[in-house]
Swiss-Prot record:
It is found in: Nucleus. This is Homeobox expressed in ES cells 1. The gene is HESX1. Disulfide bonds: none annotated. Keywords: Developmental protein, DNA-binding, Homeobox, Nucleus, Transcription, Transcription regulation. Gene3D superfamilies: Homeodomain-like. Residues 108-167 bind DNA. Can form heterodimers with PROP1 in binding to DNA. Interacts with TLE1.
Amino acid sequence: MSPSLQEGAQLGESKPSTCSFSIERILGLDQKKDCVPLMKPHRPWADTCSSSGKDGNLCLHVPNPPSGISFPSVVDHPMPEERASKYENYFSASERLSLKRELSWYRGRRPRTAFTQNQIEVLENVFRVNCYPGIDIREDLAQKLNLEEDRIQIWFQNRRAKLKRSHRESQFLMAKKNFNTNLLE
């Protein structure tokens, strides 16, 4: 082996550095494998603990930092289903059900908005006049109908898709009718 290759081989065999940071620490691989993460993303529609915390579930309350100090955001990666089975001995049945619910596919999905008949009538009337309302109209509707503006925006998107679908179906039925009458003649 040439001297330069021997030097390269010796460099690869050198002892690991004792830096204050490492790939394992950055990735969180140096933590205990069977610990449960305390931080959860803020999803008020999915919170299982009450405001008092008396229902048995632990709630983590983080105080606000002093003004002028900012912290990097914590990214919560979903735990794989197979790791959930490791924790079955440590949690009660209700806690396991809650954990499984969190691990399911709909974890971050918000609940479906149930519009009242009055809200639908108002939205339909506005849609007949303008199927692309601007932000000012949507915010005004949100205030009048006691809804969030983004829910109104989604309603209009869905309503436009429904109109497009029904228009496409009517075009198909007209073409089918014309085709059938031409065959009979």
